[in-house]
Amino acid sequence: SLILCAAMPAIPAAAAETADEEAPARLGPAAYWGTVTWMDEDTFLLDSGKEDGLGDAVVVHVGDAPYLDAVTGNTLNLETLEDGDAVYAWVGPAMALSLPPQSTASLIVGNIPADYAVPQYYEITSSTVTEESAVLHVAGSNDTITVPASAKLTPYLTKNIVTLADLRPGARILVWSDSKGTPEKVLVFAYGYRGYISVAEDG
């Protein structure tokens, strides 16, 4: 894998919050969108056709990346992804310095309806969990995401029960939000993270 994740040592809550405020956000997977042109059975060119905030074109190595339906979150068969189809792909953060750049996918989302608000993919770096919500810091951003207790949490490919307490550092999540930007559905991917920071309600 091109992504190297180091375990974070447990430190006091106040110190963790100060570090989050002062330190630049750790790089996370980068989002690209566009249409697909297959190069071989495991690699495609993803080209948005224009310069924008998500970049222009990137060569995506699929590897073991899940391919999911943008609306339902259900797994799709990668063999159904054809040239000309539009997808979002989260890659990296490591990029090969080539033209176009190359990277390995973490997640691919397809079957995107027109004008649909595509769910967003994050890696959690720290969490503050209460009975009412989970406030998350995520890689690649200094902003926080607040997941309310009312949000529907679902595990990826398992029948385990997941709760707000499972939104811990190291977890990767796919988040669908309502028109106000409040998360209403969260798909939680399996992880095996140790030495994480979790700030409890009582400190």
Predicted regions and their residues:
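Short, structured beta-strand/loop micro-motifs enriched in basic residues and often containing a Trp
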Residues: 63-73, 150-159
